[in-house]
């Protein structure tokens, strides 16, 4: 099935701009951050198809998606939920932040037996 969503070149460019801003201590461009978040979300959905875990990146530039094999959740609050902010999500996906360290620092809130993305991180950025 062909991937839909963010163009790979646009996604890579946005990720690079966001990481460069973070590294320089500059304000991160919100448009680039939104593209980077959605790009990584799409890549994670491809890498771990399914509906067992709900990943939430709240806010106007955030998103929510389901991934991971296992029981599908259909009503109410999902039993396996991960929530983090957009910058932490990009840093995790890019390999700039360790999963367990982010959870320990409270940058990621994960609940449920399947709420662990560590085996999927970092996310490789595909070529065009």
Where are these regions (language model features)?
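Feature captures hydrophobic
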Residues: 1-128
């Amino acid at each position: 099935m062909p991937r839909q969503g963010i163009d790979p070149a646009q996604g890579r460019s946005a990720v690079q701009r966001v990481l460069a801003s973070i590294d320089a201590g500059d304000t991160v461009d919100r448009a680039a951050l939104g593209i980077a978040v959605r790009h990584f979300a799409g890549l994670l959905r491809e890498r771990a198809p399914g509906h067992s875990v709900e990943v939430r990146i709240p806010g106007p530039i955030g998103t929510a998606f389901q991934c991971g094999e296992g029981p599908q959740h259909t009503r109410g609050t999902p039993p396996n939920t991960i929530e983090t902010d957009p910058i932490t999500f990009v840093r995790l996906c890019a390999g700039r932040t360790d999963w367990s360290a982010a959870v320990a620092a409270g940058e990621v809130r994960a609940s449920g037996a399947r709420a662990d993305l560590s085996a999927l991180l970092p996310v490789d950025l595909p070529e065009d």
